[in-house]
Amino acid sequence: MFSKKWIIVALGAVSLPAFAAVENYTVDPDHTYPSLEMTHMGLSVWRGKFNKSSGKITLDRAAKTGNVEIVVDAASIDFGHEKMHEHAVSADWLNVEKFPTMNYKGAIKFKGDMPASVDGQLTLHGVTKPVTLKINSFKCMPHPMLKKEVCGADAEGDLDRADFGMTKYTDGGAGKIHMRIQVEAIKQD
């Protein structure tokens, strides 16, 4: 009888990690803005952001794993300059008529107890390539108005437009893109 109790306790302890909750979050489109920086003919740095994005994030903090899926409306790019917008959405660059969205799917990597990076695949302009994002900050807290946990992060990474088949106007360093992503996501019940 004594050994039977210990077997039950041991099995229960071993199975506890299997019941660790995977937490699901929905990206808050009002507080999430993928943005980019690139040179304008090597003269200055232009900054733009995408105003429409959606997605989901999963976190398993006990297992120190997670996943990210983000969809960005390519036509929502905003440089604050109409001519630049027209050029960016044209066939010369994003070609939003043919490729209306950009998709990023990746696995979150932890360093200690905190997410540190996302190793993922970006589909842009019909081409899928690996892109790693470094997470510079990450925090979760109960949101005072939503009464739910909300997590926020700032991440960054680099890509070359030519890798995605966008080779027009890449001289002068304009092909190199530095991305910055601010994201907030709301925990789902």
Predicted regions located by residue number:
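Gram-negative bacterial Sec-dependent N-terminal signal peptides
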Residues: F2-F19
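Low-complexity, acidic/polar, glycine-enriched regions of mature
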Residues: A20-D189
